[in-house]
């Protein structure tokens, strides 16, 4: 097979002084950070959809890219050609993982039966590619939002027959993920929401999607899948309002249906932006709630109201994200998947490498800065000092339920409490973070 990226052998680490645009300056897979290999901390993955499925089309223009596997031809043969190029890319980029939707890797076919047959053939192709390359599957998922049948949602659709079609795709994609050794399975509700409340029964749709997720959990245990189930929050787009709005909303949903011990979250930076949150906020919230799973590493544009899916380039933002992840013990089954695409004007095939290399270097440098923050411990010390009162007798009595509201009021009066506000020192802490970021 002729190489598609024929001007490149493999992307390698050359160090911070390198000016080679096809080399890593900060990502050194074998470098030890806090006693652990950088590759094992970051667990990078490249995604199939933006990298190999998007043809450069947008709402105002047709496809701008010249990808051989996107030309007219026999669907399965083109899918196999796409797989050839994808695994060439994964190998040359030196990522240990990849991610896909079902219809990214396999033709959808004209019927559910044809869909399943096509997918089964492509799973065998992917299994062989994984064996040859050593690249593993971080997670798989089903695209239950592109087909016109899902215009009113999949699990939240008013038609139970559409719900059943979605179940077919999800069970097939879960089985494929399991067979390929995937470490997670993701559920993103692209159209699980509404356009208008005038034709929407919120209680009904919530019950439907709750039951759907319960069925997914049941199937996971039935098939013996040991990976993690993940919901990916997003507030809107393509619907006006989605039910998985943000991490906190997802947690409330999981609690309602008794799923908080079964499903975690896959957090995308751009989705946090759309929800009016920082990426840091969503990561910290998931960790605090015990549902942190994996990350879609990208960036949005705060001046735009849609999902731009750009590659992450902000060390300032991502150092704080990696700091939270390190403090929480790091990834288990999750990782950093680049849910990002080159711009429509970036028509050189090597732009795919430039985008990923920059993103990987950004996250690697962020990791190293976060490690310095952890080792220094100053931020943790200051937070602990701020809440120290809760480790005292009064604080512990309150938290352990040993005082009622009335008893606490009586205590305050008897002890003539008149506490004085203590400074939060926000500016000092911001300066401290800048020292980690910019001082050698």
UniProtKB/Swiss-Prot annotation:
Binding site for Mg(2+) 2: 268, 271, 307, 309
Positions contributing to Mg(2+) 1 binding: 232, 268, 296, 339
Compartments reported by the entry: Cytoplasm
Catalytic activity entry: alpha-D-xylose = alpha-D-xylulofuranose
Active site per UniProt: 101, 104
Enzyme Commission numbers on file: 5.3.1.5
Comment on bound cofactor: Binds 2 magnesium ions per subunit.
One GO location term (cellular component): cytoplasm
Keywords linked to the UniProt accession: Carbohydrate metabolism, Cytoplasm, Isomerase, Magnesium, Metal-binding, Xylose metabolism
InterPro entries: Xyl_isomerase-like_sf, Xylose_isom_bac, Xylose_isomerase
GO biological process, one term: D-xylose metabolic process
One GO MF term: xylose isomerase activity
Cofactor: Mg(2+)
Enzyme class (EC, first level): isomerase
Main localisation: cytoplasm
Keyword 4Fe-4S: no
Isomerase recorded as keyword: yes
Matching HAMAP family: Xylose_isom_A
Subunit and partners: Homotetramer.
Family that this chain belongs to: Belongs to the xylose isomerase family.
Name of this protein: Xylose isomerase
Lineage of the species this protein comes from: Bacteria, Pseudomonadati, Pseudomonadota, Gammaproteobacteria, Enterobacterales
